[in-house]
């Protein structure tokens, strides 16, 4: 089946998860897990898969929805069987252009938007995806504490941030998008960077080392990952089609920060703001240009500019129906070859 290899690559083996969470301090009995669907689905936009999608028959066309739901089953089972934690799982997806950010930066998320064009070369997959997302939305209504949320024209990362902002528990974001690495700056929040057996649980302590892993340069001083959300406006971000500031890449910026720390000219990381870092770095970058990039790259800044109505809209699809018979009937009728793992999805559920 064409969907399984990609989906299974996002299910980290329990053995590796055990290493990640062996000394993990949980702040409550609840864990929020946010799954960036665009990050996963981007792997299906490949020309070598087009013929495979065209050859799908019957119920094979809707197998993607059950495979995605089983990602939730995988992580729910892990956190309950290994750590006795109740999980709330949120799939989130960019269904509309992030208009506010595109006004400031017209090419923002351009590649994501173009590949979703129903009339383009990925027309077959987009039609399959449309049906599967509709089914995923339906399934999530009947599975306890699993939700499918749409961005509806907002920056997609605001969807998980809105929920994080209203709950005191551990938050784990499953993503491959460097834009979202900034989530490590927020309380009790971690990024699970998915990459088969090389997957990494990112936090404030290891983020800077991780983004420099392919570079020869290594800082002499500890650099807190909290800085990432402040330097992101300077950096390129392929996932969002952000070109960054020429000549001001991550190595150059972190080198400068490292030198300032050595010379005792750098403040506490917690005391930094966008403006103070801009002055300290003194990189000969136009303030208005970098500030405009900050307004579309900093998640907390964007969130603070939302109205109450906007925040309510972000929660529109938080629906629970809890009808066991309905979900069992759907499973036995449509997903015989790729069943939804219902037993795992009910692990540790609290009513």
Range-by-range predicted roles:
Residues 67, 71-74, 256, 276, ...:
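Charge-rich, solvent-exposed alpha-helical interaction surfaces
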Residues 2-18, 85-86, 110-317, 321, ...:
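Extended two-metal-dependent nuclease catalytic cores across DNA- and RNA-processing enzymes
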Residues 325-351:
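Long, highly charged low-complexity segments enriched in Glu/Asp and Lys/Arg with interspersed Ser/Thr
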């Amino acid at each position: 089946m064409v969907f399984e290899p990609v989906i299974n690559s996002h299910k980290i083996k329990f053995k590796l998860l055990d290493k990640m969470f062996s000394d993990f301090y949980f702040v409550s009995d609840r864990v929020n897990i946010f799954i960036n669907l665009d990050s996963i689905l981007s792997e299906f936009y490949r020309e070598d898969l087009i013929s495979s999608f065209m050859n799908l028959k019957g119920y094979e066309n809707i197998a993607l929805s059950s495979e995605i739901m089983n990602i939730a089953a995988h992580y729910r089972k892990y956190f309950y069987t290994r750590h006795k934690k109740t999980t709330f799982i949120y799939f989130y997806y960019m269904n509309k252009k992030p208009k506010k950010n595109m006004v400031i930066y017209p090419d923002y998320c351009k590649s994501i938007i173009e590949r979703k064009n129903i009339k383009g070369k990925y027309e077959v997959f987009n039609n399959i995806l449309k049906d599967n997302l509709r089914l995923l939305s339906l399934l999530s209504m009947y599975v306890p504490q699993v939700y499918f949320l749409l961005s509806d024209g907002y920056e997609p990362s605001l969807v998980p941030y809105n929920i994080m902002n209203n709950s005191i528990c551990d938050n784990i974001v499953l993503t491959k998008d460097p834009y979202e690495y900034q989530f490590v700056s927020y309380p009790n929040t971690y990024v699970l960077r998915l990459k088969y057996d090389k997957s990494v649980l990112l936090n404030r302590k290891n983020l800077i080392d991780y983004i420099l892993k392919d570079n020869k340069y290594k800082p002499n001083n500890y650099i807190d990952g909290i800085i990432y959300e402040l330097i992101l406006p300077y950096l390129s971000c392929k996932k969002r089609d952000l070109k960054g500031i020429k000549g001001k890449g991550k190595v150059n910026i972190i080198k400068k920060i490292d030198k300032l720390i050595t010379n005792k000219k750098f403040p506490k990381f917690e005391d930094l703001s966008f403006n103070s870092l801009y002055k300290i770095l003194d990189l000969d970058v136009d303030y208005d240009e970098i500030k405009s990039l900050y307004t579309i790259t900093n998640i907390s800044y964007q969130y603070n500019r939302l109205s109450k109505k906007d925040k309510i809209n972000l929660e529109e699809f938080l629906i629970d129906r809890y009808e066991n018979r309905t979900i069992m009937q759907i499973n036995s009728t449509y997903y015989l070859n790729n069943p939804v793992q219902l037993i795992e999805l009910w692990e540790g559920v609290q009513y």
